[in-house]
Each structure stands twice: as structure tokens, then as C-alpha cells.
Amino acid sequence: MDSITKTHDVYNLNAPKWEFFLRSYMGGNDYRDGNYLLKYILEDKHEYQKRIDLTPLDNHCKNVINIYSSFIWRLPPTRNFGNLVEDQALNSFLKDADMDGRSLNAFMSEAQMWSGVYGHVWLIMDKPAVIANTRADELAQEVRPYLTLITPENVLDWNYERALNGRYELTMLKVREWVEDDDAFYRIWEKDTIKGYEVIGEEAKLVETMDNPLGMIPAVCLYGNRSPIRGIGHSDITDVAYMQRAIYNELSEIEQLIR
């Protein structure tokens, strides 16, 4: 159980920051639920909640991220596919990159935006484990690769090793795919195997295992800004989020003085 839910040391250091940056970008109830107003010494719970409800948020974080993203994606990227330009599977992928209706451009625009919020996100490419007799059957059933975006709080552990050619390669990736009450599902990617564990309370059960035919982990870390630590990025709103919180508290003080 401990080995399944164990997290990277760097994850533990950064998880509170990721939550703060996410709430700062989302605003609204997400920000209010973070309780970022400084509490007065003799203030009770009801008074504190009332002050939170009365204090507006001027969301600078969302403005910074969205303006920067709109500037980058003002013109769509140009891609050269060579002989694959007429490939049916490729064109299906370009139109629906994540099997959820988002085109590749829309998916990458969203990935760029979230990497700006968190500092980085993970992109995993997978393909349904459906047996098709022919290529035509695959195309008919839309059995093709697709992308998944994983935000940092759901990538619990990872490991890089330097290959013989000097390049660093990802050798392990632990992803929390879903959580519901005390029930959670973890997928651990390695170069030779892919294992899925269901964790209920304190008990972990191996529910699926398969060979990894690629011999590599089909995942990349998309950085908003690189940090000195591999697998960790630097958020675009690192300073803005704290400035926004200070303004938020100052607005509360002004509102209290007026009242």
C-alpha cells in the first residue's frame, strides 16, 4: 500500500503551491474556499465567513494567463506532415486529439494555459487496447492514439535516468487517475510494464497489468517555465498570485472601514 501511494519528495513540497495557484486562477468559490483572508484575533467563524462573502476578488492571475495565451495562439501553428498529410488516422487525431472533441490546437492551447498556471503539466499518449484484424477495422472503430493532459497534483511520483547516449529518459510515472471518497485508482507506467491499482481505504489491489510494447513511457512534461528540478516547472503567476492575495486582503480592510 505505501509503495503505491508514496509520493515524490518534490511533490510534497510543491503540492500546496499548486493548490494555491489553481485557486488563484479559478477565482470565485474556489478562491473563497481557500480562506485566504487573514483572520482577526477575536473573529468567530460566522463573522469570518461573512467577511469572505463580502470581499470581491480582482483576478489578476486569470488576466495574466489568458492574455499571454491569446497572444501565443493568435496565429495557429504550421505543421508539416510530409507523406502523412492524407492519412485518415492523423486527420482524425488533428480534429479530435483527446477523444473528447478537442482539436490538437485546442488541446495544446489548453495544455499551454495550465502549464502557465501550475508551471508544468504532463501529456500522455495512449491507444485503446482493442484488437482489430486489419487497418481498415482500426479506422472504422477509431482505434488510434489520443492525448491526455494530467495536472501536477495527479502525478504523484516520477523518475528520470540518464541513458547511454547521455539523454535523460523517463523510467517511471505514477498517475492518480481518479478519486471518489476513499476509493482511488493509480496507474504506474514503467518502460516494460503498465500496472493499475485500485486503493480502497488502506488496501491496494492490483486490478490490471500489461506489457508496455513501446519500451518507453509515452509521456512528456510540458513546462511553462523550466526550474532547476527535472519534472517541476515554474508558474507564470508565482508572484502575481501573492500580489493578488495582498490586494484581496486590502480590499477586505477597506470594506470593513467603510462599514
Outline where the language-model segments fall:
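Intrinsically disordered, low-complexity regions of eukaryotic proteins
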Residues: H46, T55, H60, V179, ...
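Intrinsically disordered, low-complexity segments enriched in small/polar residues
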Residues: Y25-M26, R32, N80, M99, ...
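Extended, helix-rich architectural segments
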Residues: M1-L147
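Generic detector of solvent-exposed, compositionally biased contiguous segments
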Residues: A89-D96, P145-A163, M216, C221-P228
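Extended, Lys/Arg-enriched charged tracts that mediate electrostatic binding to polyanionic substrates
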Residues: L104, S109-V207
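Extended, charged amphipathic alpha-helical segments
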Residues: K205-R259
